[in-house]
């Protein structure tokens, strides 16, 4: 498929049960001359990411669902998710350990220096690999790694042995790395060619000073929210634009992450990346997630990253037809950068323009203009990528968002006029919901609470339109609520309520900053 795409057509194709989910440019004839051939080497060997095919039916990824699930197309081997995704936690839930259990996120970690735990872990993972081989799977093809990664928790053992290991390596990752190396030695002896995967994540992202991972260890480094530091959502993960030392109380700077990551790359034979910098909580207050993508993946390419697990919370199957946002475009760009992180400026912009045209026709240019405006309306400096770790208002330029609200509305009104079909028009209106949420939030204090009669009337007009649109489309207004279960109702809306407060009220996650929607009091 990629051969035909690159050499013959600009067609988009997504295999689906219904015929209307195909998108192909009109073509009466495609000439395929004899002897045509092509060889390409992707930037990253492993390219299978979470949400590789969007659940949103307006989105047409340039790949077929049928091939996205094959190991050969995405680089031989299990997905990064399976290769380093809290394997010890799953082993505990399977009853592998006599004295350790892990039932939910946040439960205590095991003692990684405990001899009984190590013995039982070895028995469990060896048996797991033996069972896979017995079923006919081949190391290096159907599977390449065994997942011995830590459970999803920041509550680590503080026994004498673990603390001694931490002191010796001057790194919290020491006990986990020691355990991983033991498992790696076992696997190297019994199953040559098999990788052993660990996480550098949520308490273990700091590399050790002395001990290095065995040659068959894959380190999955997570650009995430750690115990004492947070990823900056405003700058590239290369850390070059962030301050060396965080200026907020959360430790927000990509400089620290970049330095840790580069050291893991230096001491490890293979590094994969968990990529988190996309919209998460309070998703209706959408922030730009495309402005740093190119720099991020060039950075990863320079340091020889093997592959990725893309972790984002917006373009998900359960949002099907209920949310259009910048993250959908971001996911597509990521898929293309995984194949070629070195495309030219012309190629990069052409790729985006082409994709936006497929989604929205001529309207796509206006929607992309809005996406670029989002980046220009964000606050300066470093701020956390996930809203639950910050004040969403603190990452916005409130004044610019408020003052440009009418401009943004006009972008979408024009986009509706140019929509080539009823489906595209619906998609444009759905995409406008996040714009209205952002603009109403920024305008509430100055235009409604303290505005003139004319300003209040205009705010009321816009708010009423948005309310009706959100209910009519069952817009996925907040995580865990709204479109996914069809619960968004007219009674959920109250014009006297700050739109940010409504978003927080309907969300299943909350910010660590209380009453962040009262930005004028902060």
Predicted regions, residues:
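Substrate-binding cleft/loops of secretory-pathway carbohydrate-active enzymes
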Residues: 197-231, 284-291, 317-329, 434-436
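Conserved radical SAM core fold
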Residues: 107, 153-155, 222-246, 278-280
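Feature activates predominantly on carbohydrate-active enzymes
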Residues: 1-178, 188, 262-286
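Acidic, His- and aromatic-enriched active-site or binding-groove loops in soluble protein domains
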Residues: 166-186, 214-233, 300, 333-343
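Structured mid-domain segments that build the active-site/substrate or prosthetic-cofactor binding neighborhood
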Residues: 109-119, 126-127, 134, 240-365, ...
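Aromatic-lined carbohydrate-recognition surfaces of secreted/lumenal glycan-active proteins
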Residues: 180-206, 271-280, 308-313
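Catalytic domains of carbohydrate-active enzymes that cleave complex glycans
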Residues: 332-522
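Structural preference for beta-strand elements that scaffold enzyme active sites
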Residues: 48, 143-147, 195-197, 216-220, ...
